Amino acid sequence: MKGLLFIISLLFLTLHQRVWAYQVEGMKSDVICADIRFTVHCICNELGRFPTARLTKPCPWPNRERRSTDDEDYLFEEDEDEEFFHPRALSRPTAAKYDDEILEDEVSFHSRTKRDIAFHEECCNIRTEHKCNRTTVELYCRRYSP
């Protein structure tokens, strides 16, 4: 019985570990799984893309001035002061072009507006992935040079 409890506890701890989203160097954050499209909108505005677009609610991070350090090792450290780390350029997978044929991933863009797709194309291009409520969501982040 104790062995079974130990195995279940170990399995729970393994599955419950924290997964960080891909970030611009020196940044780390959790993905806001419930509202990825709004997060992309916030990030595009923060990066100065589509600055005329008005947000209907505040962006999900309280203090956009503070950033984590530029040390890459810092990306994997835990920190109690999480409220200052915010997402960068999150999105869903794009259609991949292969020769003259376009291959769609499991998420279709037919239901998305042209403006949503424009946000995605403007802000995102480096691929990684993150587990969002047991669903893999692909994230993209363009590195902007100052």
From Swiss-Prot:
GO molecular function terms attached to this record: hormone activity
Tissue expression profile of the protein: Androgenic gland.
Primary location group: secreted
UniProt-listed GO biological process terms: cell differentiation; sex differentiation; spermatogenesis
InterPro entries hit by this protein: AGH (IPR020382)
Glycosites: N133
Prodomain residues: 68-113
Subcellular location: Secreted
Disulfide bridge positions per record: C33-C123, C42-C59, C44-C141, C124-C132
Keywords of this entry: Cleavage on pair of basic residues, Developmental protein, Differentiation, Disulfide bond, Glycoprotein, Hormone, Secreted, Sexual differentiation, Signal, Spermatogenesis
Pfam families: AGH
Keyword Glycoprotein: yes
Repeat as UniProt keyword: no
Leader peptide range in chain numbering: 1-21
One GO cellular component term: extracellular region
The protein's role, per its UniProt record: Controls sex differentiation and the formation of male appendages, spermatogenesis, pigmentation, and male specific behavior.
Full protein name: Androgenic gland hormone
